[in-house]
Each structure stands twice: as C-alpha cells, then as structure tokens.
Amino acid sequence: MGAGRRAAALGKKVAMIENRVIGGTCVNVGCVPKKVMLNLASYLEEASLFKDYGVNGTEGLKLDFPAFKERRDAYVKRLNGIYSNNIAK
C-alpha cells in the first residue's frame, strides 16, 4: 500500500486490489489485533505488580472479553477507515 501511494504521489497510475477488508492480513487479523491483545496482557501483568508499590484495589482484575473484543475491533475498523481515506487522496 505504501509503494502504491508513493507511486501515485510521483504521478504514476496505480491500481490496488484488495479481496477483503482494506488493510490486508496484518491490519485485520494478524499483527494489529495480536499486538492489541499483547498490550492488554502486559497491562494486566503490570497491574498485578502495583500492590508491591502500595497501590490498592488492583487485586482480582477480571477481563470483560466481549467489551475488549468490541474495542479491539473498533480500533481495526478505524485503521481500515484511515487506509481507505489515504487511498482516496
């Protein structure tokens, strides 16, 4: 996608083909969703250490997975919109 945008910026004609949602595997089901989940796991791990520094109330944190999934999917959808907007330029 980056190469296509650069070529278009240099005046070349470009055709981009996407058989699914714009952004490809990385944005939609690979790198991005995985990193969002990894970040959440890191946050939960960090929160489990807060009590060692005198922060109370972080014991027994529970993940509301449907709410998390909704937020993760909204983030991916936002990226799809950014890609669509960039292509339209």
Which residue ranges define each predicted feature?
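Glycine-rich flavin
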Residues: 5-12, 17-89
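Residues forming the Rossmann-fold NAD(P)(H) cofactor-binding site
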Residues: 1
